[in-house]
Amino acid sequence: MATPTESEFAAPIPQTNPGSYEELHRKARDVFPTCFEGAKLMVNKGLSSHFQVSHTLSLSAMNTGYRFGATYVGTNQVGPAEAYPILLGDTDVNGNTTATILHQMGIYRTKLQGQIQQGKLAGAQATIERKGRLSTLGLTLANIDLVNEAGILVGQFLRRLTPRLDVGTEMVYQYGKNIPGGQISVLSYAARYTANHFIAAATLGASGVHLTYYHKQHDNLAFGVEFECNANVGEAVTTLAYQTELPEEGVTMRASFDTNWSVGGVFEKRLSQQLPFTLALSGTLNHVKAAGKFGIGLIIG
């Protein structure tokens, strides 16, 4: 295996790079609403051009409390709106903390994630990617426990075959004493086709099928369709979503419904052109279970 050269740590990522394997379905998923329940107040405050903090107060039956978050963006500019390193973190009053560190050195990109729950390390993950001219190679180590001999290893490869077609593969390997046989591995394959106004992506493996379709009708209207089939439990769900924007009115609406007869939506309205106040309304309804949830939020900053 060739060792990285000094020029590779300084070279920019080529424009023809297909991106990360984990972002295959991201474009369609961005259309889907992120619904919430209860009342939420979020205040974002930029302390400098590189440092920002946030305060979030939530009131709901499932989650009531306060969270503090901080974001730092470094000075290493690698794109028009992309700079590294990036440090993200948030914590609540009980000390439950999540943190993420992102850094890019030339064609190499690293990501470190950690989570602390009730004073104990609940999860840790490290990822490194090599982004070449036409391909991305990634390796992830998750929850590696040297004492109990357990952990998860994920290898990913994404290759650009034509300007519109990308193909890839992923291998997930998990080992541990609580796994039948001591270890298990799952291999899956993926493809993505990008056209002028739509993106279609597919992931196929022994555990199931994941299909997404993104369609941009025009600048302010987009649709997303997702099909997920889990072969292990014998379930399949299809979800249709849309996102529409009215920039002049400061309005963004996202909504979705699926084959389980669940409907959800998030409506966001900028209250003032001079002040950074945004009102968010969220609602979900399952017609089969006759269960619904409602949320209201105010975002400042």
Swiss-Prot record:
This is Mitochondrial import receptor subunit TOM40 homolog. PANTHER family: MITOCHONDRIAL IMPORT RECEPTOR SUBUNIT TOM40. It is a multi-pass membrane protein. It is found in: Mitochondrion outer membrane. Coiled coil: none annotated. GO terms for molecular function: porin activity; protein transmembrane transporter activity. One of its GO terms (biological process) is protein import into mitochondrial matrix. CDD domains: Porin3_Tom40. One of its GO terms (cellular component) is mitochondrial outer membrane translocase complex. Channel-forming protein essential for import of protein precursors into mitochondria. Specifically required for nnt-1 accumulation in the mitochondria and may be involved in the secretion of daf-28/insulin from the mitochondria. Required for embryonic and larval development. Residues 1-20 are annotated as: Disordered. It holds the Pfam family Porin_3. It comes from Caenorhabditis briggsae. Keywords: Ion transport, Membrane, Mitochondrion, Mitochondrion outer membrane, Porin, Protein transport, Transmembrane, Transmembrane beta strand, Transport. It comes from the Eukaryota. InterPro entries: Porin_dom_sf (IPR023614), Porin_Euk/Tom40 (IPR027246), Tom40 (IPR037930). Its main location: mitochondrion.
